[in-house]
């Protein structure tokens, strides 16, 4: 049977329990919202195929449990991930503070050149906000990664976040393919052009 896609990208959603990872995933994969999801047990995944630059990209998106007791299971899935979304809840200060711990997990268990993005979820609940957008932006800048505020409930920026991450992964892959020589393959993941790309993103998105 012929393949129905040109690329397969494995993505991972990580963050504390209750920040809305499952809701973000369902909004993107099913265009649906359910406020009564129970906490993910272990790990689950959804698939959605999107089109970018005339190519069909199959996104396999893994939703991980945020509880400490599942940490050993979920970190095993970091290794093959090409993109990781770190999710916190803007109404929960602790979930934001823990993003640094989640980044340490990525550094320990994931590929060195994995694409990352921080999502401040539940931005529709502004009256209960504990974490300002500026703090989210600063944290992302500290680590040199992208940031967006999202709402699975109000369908704000969810689609944009996944498409942006997929586009960055594809750009990195294309760059590696272009430089298929021994020197070129290493240069495909140079830090400098990536940082330039990120800085231009912030000028456009974080206004």
From Swiss-Prot:
Residues that make up the propeptide removed upon maturation: 205-207
Residue span of motif Switch 1: 31-45
E.C. numbers: 3.6.5.2
CDD domains for the chain: Rab8_Rab10_Rab13_like (cd01867)
Residues bearing PTM Phosphoserine: 181, 185
Sites of S-geranylgeranyl cysteine lipidation: 204
Keyword Cell membrane: yes
InterPro entries for this protein: P-loop_NTPase, Small_GTP-bd, Small_GTPase, Small_GTPase_Rab
Residues with Phosphothreonine modification: 72
Membrane topology: Lipid-anchor
Record has Phosphoprotein as a keyword: yes
UniProt xrefs under Pfam families: Ras (PF00071)
UniProt GO MF annotations: GDP binding; GTP binding; GTPase activity; myosin V binding; protein tyrosine kinase binding; small GTPase binding
Gene3D superfamilies in the cross-refs: P-loop containing nucleotide triphosphate hydrolases (3.40.50.300)
GO CC term, one of those recorded: lysosome
Keywords tagged on the record: Autophagy, Cell membrane, Cell projection, Cilium, Cilium biogenesis/degradation, Cytoplasm, Cytoplasmic vesicle, Cytoskeleton, Endosome, Golgi apparatus, GTP-binding, Hydrolase, Lipoprotein, Lysosome, Membrane, Methylation, Nucleotide-binding, Phosphoprotein, Prenylation, Protein transport, Proto-oncogene, Transport
Primary location class: membrane
Residues annotated as binding Mg(2+): 22, 40, 63
Family membership: Belongs to the small GTPase superfamily. Rab family.
Quaternary structure and partners: Interacts (GTP-bound form) with MICALL1; regulates RAB8A association with recycling endosomes. Interacts with MICALL2; competes with RAB13 and is involved in E-cadherin endocytic recycling. Interacts (GTP-bound form) with MICAL1, MICALCL, MICAL3, EHBP1 and EHBP1L1; at least in case of MICAL1, MICALCL, MICAL3 and EHBP1L1 two molecules of RAB8A can bind to one molecule of the effector protein; ternary complexes of RAB8A, RAB13 and either MICAL1 or EHBP1L1 are possible. Interacts with EHD1. Interacts with MAP4K2 and SYTL4. Interacts with SGSM1 and SGSM3.
Protein name: Ras-related protein Rab-8A
Lineage of origin: Eukaryota, Metazoa, Chordata, Craniata, Vertebrata
């Amino acid at each position: 049977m012929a393949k129905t896609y040109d690329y397969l990208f494995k993505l991972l959603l990580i963050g504390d329990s209750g920040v809305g990872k499952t809701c973000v995933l369902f909004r993107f994969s099913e265009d649906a919202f359910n406020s009564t999801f129970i906490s993910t047990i272990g790990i689950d995944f959804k698939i959605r195929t999107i089109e970018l630059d005339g190519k069909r990209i199959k996104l396999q998106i893994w939703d991980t449990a945020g509880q400490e007791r599942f940490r050993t299971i979920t970190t095993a899935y970091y290794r093959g991930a090409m993109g990781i979304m770190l999710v916190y809840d803007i109404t929960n200060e602790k979930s934001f503070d823990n993003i640094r711990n989640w980044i340490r997990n990525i550094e320990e268990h994931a590929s060195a050149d994995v694409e990352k993005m921080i999502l401040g979820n539940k931005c529709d609940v502004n009256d209960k906000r504990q974490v300002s957008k500026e703090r989210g932006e600063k944290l992302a800048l500290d680590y040199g990664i992208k940031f967006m505020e999202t709402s699975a409930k109000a369908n704000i920026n969810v689609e944009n976040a996944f498409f942006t991450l997929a586009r960055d992964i594809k750009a990195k892959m294309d760059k590696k393919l272009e430089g298929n020589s021994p020197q070129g393959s290493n240069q495909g993941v140079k830090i400098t052009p990536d940082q330039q790309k990120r800085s231009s993103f912030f000028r456009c998105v974080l206004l």
